[in-house]
């Protein structure tokens, strides 16, 4: 025992000395030491991981951009950019080459097969080619009756619960019911019953926990602490496994259907694709995750921002009610005429981006030119949506909701609209872009056609109270919906 204590002390001191030496090296001598950033972020990845788990990392990154400029160091081996040109430099293709994804971030579960978001370039190309069938114009036309039926049911449920404007309705909850229902149907024909039963399907209810776990694991993996964090949150991971098991059962039912359907995974079931059941499940999870909660967040954010800005609300209501004489005229095709509503959605993407963080890539060993600067090899790089969308050098009055900036308004002539890319750019941009715009415009057009809306608590700081874990942890948005009398 007398020999053990000195050995323990010496070992502890050696470990502390190593950690301090490593932190000093990271701050002053690392290849990225020339790039500015707060010292604790530059010294250790634990700082970034802490704020990601705390849900305020997007604010910290924005603060550093305000302090240091358009490129900042947010971890020992990671940079954030708010250059407009960095979109193509990071996510585009140059001479047939593109920066690889930072797979420690995207592969949060090593047991999960690669999917459309996490796959390498070659695998992604194959998956996207076969999934493209489900997102084609013909497929969307074939699926339009399904979407219209569910949107009509959403409006019916809102009308029932609104009680002629006398009862408070949480539109965030109902938008989530609808978007999960729609993406479940479109992806693999699942009938989740959220709207029909007026309550969460147990599997959908588990998605909130799933998104939180994915956010935690992405943060941990990005700084090499995946196994430790996985052990610490093991009780939270158990519901995720149940979520995946139930999803696998639903996918199994769909793969047993021999009749061809126009849903998204039909292209993955072709004999020449040869995907395992696990790979199909992984892709279904990715598609549902990308097309459900983020779409509901966009809808809720747009409605909240409009109700907080009466002039803009009046314009979008006038556009909807002057364009359509009957509800049957409001279709996926006809809503494309709603230019002001499209501007509102684009402004919401900027003002309240559903995904706040960066989608990280990694530079090759020889380095890469990004934003006109040489970035050393093996550096994680990304554009953080919250930072670039609120950069006063790119947007006039960035914390003000003004859809007019997307309609050539002279007062916003200095805005750099090319800085907004909510669906990313390049060969790996979001495959569901057109569906997202069509679905959200359809729901909002029906909503403003049927109802006059009023916030239940006009003083609620709905936007300011939220944390972000890959997507926003959005609270209830309660309002009164009074049916329009015609």
Curated annotation (Swiss-Prot):
Task: Please provide the record's keywords in A-Z order.
Answer: Glycoprotein, Heme, Iron, Metal-binding, Monooxygenase, Oxidoreductase, Signal
Q: What does the record give as cofactor?
A: heme
- Look up the EC number in the record and give it: 1.-.-.-
Q: Does the keyword Iron apply?
A: yes
Q: InterPro entries, from UniProt?
A: Cyt_P450, Cyt_P450_CS, Cyt_P450_E_grp-I, Cyt_P450_sf, Cytochrome_P450_monoxygenase
**Signal peptide bounds:** 1-21
The protein's GO terms of the molecular function aspect are:
heme binding; iron ion binding; monooxygenase activity; oxidoreductase activity, acting on paired donors, with incorporation or reduction of molecular oxygen
Q: Which residues are glycosylated?
A: 346, 434
Q: List the disulfide bonds.
A: none
Look up the record and name the pathway of this protein.
Mycotoxin biosynthesis
In which residues is heme bound?
A: 430
**What is the top EC class of this enzyme, as a single word?**
oxidoreductase
- Which PANTHER family has this protein been placed in? CYTOCHROME P450 (PTHR24305), P450, PUTATIVE (EUROFUNG)-RELATED (PTHR24305:SF230)
So what family is this one in? Answer: Belongs to the cytochrome P450 family.
Question: What does this protein's UniProt record list under function?
Answer: Cytochrome P450 monooxygenase; part of the gene cluster that mediates the biosynthesis of aphidicolin, a specific inhibitor of eukaryotic DNA synthesis and DNA polymerase alpha. The geranylgeranyl pyrophosphate synthase GGS is required for supplying a sufficient amount of geranylgeranyl diphosphate (GGDP), the general precursor of diterpenes. The diterpene synthase ACS then catalyzes the conversion of geranylgeranyl diphosphate to aphidicolan-16-beta-ol via the intermediate syn-copalyldiphosphate (syn-CDP).
Full protein name? Cytochrome P450 monooxygenase 1
Q: Which organism is this entry from?
A: Neocamarosporium betae (Beet black rot fungus)
């Amino acid at each position: 025992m007398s020999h053990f204590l000195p050995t323990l002390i010496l070992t502890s001191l050696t470990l502390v000395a190593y950690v301090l030496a490593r932190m000093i090296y990271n701050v002053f001598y690392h290849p990225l030491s020339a790039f500015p950033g707060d010292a604790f972020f530059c010294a250790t990845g634990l700082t970034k991981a802490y704020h990601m788990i705390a849900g305020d990392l997007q604010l910290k990154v924005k603060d550093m951009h305000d302090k240091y400029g358009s490129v900042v160091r947010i971890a020992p081996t990671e940079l954030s950019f708010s250059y407009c040109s960095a979109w193509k430099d990071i996510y585009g293709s140059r001479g047939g080459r593109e920066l690889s994804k930072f797979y420690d971030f995207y592969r949060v579960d090593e047991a999960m097969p690669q999917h459309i978001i996490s796959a390498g370039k070659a695998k992604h190309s194959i998956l996207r080619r076969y999934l493209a069938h489900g997102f084609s114009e013909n497929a969307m036309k074939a699926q339009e009756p399904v979407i219209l039926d569910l949107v009509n049911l959403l409006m019916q449920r809102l009308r029932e619960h609104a009680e002629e404007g006398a009862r408070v309705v949480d539109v965030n909850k109902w938008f989530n019911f609808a978007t999960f229902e729609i993406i479940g149907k479109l992806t693999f024909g699942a009938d989740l019953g959220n709207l029909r039963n007026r309550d969460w399907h147990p599997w959908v209810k588990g998605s909130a926990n799933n998104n939180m776990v994915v956010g935690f694991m992405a943060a941990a993996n990005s700084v090499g602490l995946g196994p430790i964090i996985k052990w610490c949150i093991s009780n939270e991971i158990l519901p995720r496994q149940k979520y995946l098991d139930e999803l696998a059962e639903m996918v199994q039912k769909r793969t047993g259907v021999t009749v061809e359907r126009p849903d998204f995974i039909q292209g993955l079931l072709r004999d020449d694709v040869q995907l395992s059941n696990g790979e199909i499940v992984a892709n279904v999870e990715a598609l549902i995750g990308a097309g459900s909660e983020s779409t509901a967040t966009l809808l809720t954010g747009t409605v909240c921002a409009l109700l907080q800005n009466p002039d803009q609300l009046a314009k979008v209501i006038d556009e909807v009610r002057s364009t359509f004489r009957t509800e049957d005229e409001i279709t996926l095709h006809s809503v494309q005429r709603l230019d002001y509503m499209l501007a509102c959605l684009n402004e919401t993407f900027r003002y309240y981006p559903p995904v706040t963080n960066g989608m990280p890539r990694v530079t090759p060993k020889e380095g890469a030119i990004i934003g006109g600067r040489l970035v050393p090899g093996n550096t994680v790089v990304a554009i953080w949506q919250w930072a670039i969308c609120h950069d006063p050098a790119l947007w006039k009055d960035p914390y003000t909701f003004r859809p007019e900036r997307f309609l050539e308004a002279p007062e916003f002539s200095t805005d750099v609209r090319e800085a907004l890319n909510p669906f990313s750019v390049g060969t790996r941009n979001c495959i569901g872009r057109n569906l997202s715009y069509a679905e959200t415009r359809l729901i909002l057009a029906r909503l403003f056609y049927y109802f006059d809306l009023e916030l239940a608590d006009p003083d609620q700081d709905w936007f300011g109270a939220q944390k972000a874990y890959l997507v926003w942890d959005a609270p209830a948005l309660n309002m009164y919906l009074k049916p329009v009398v015609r």
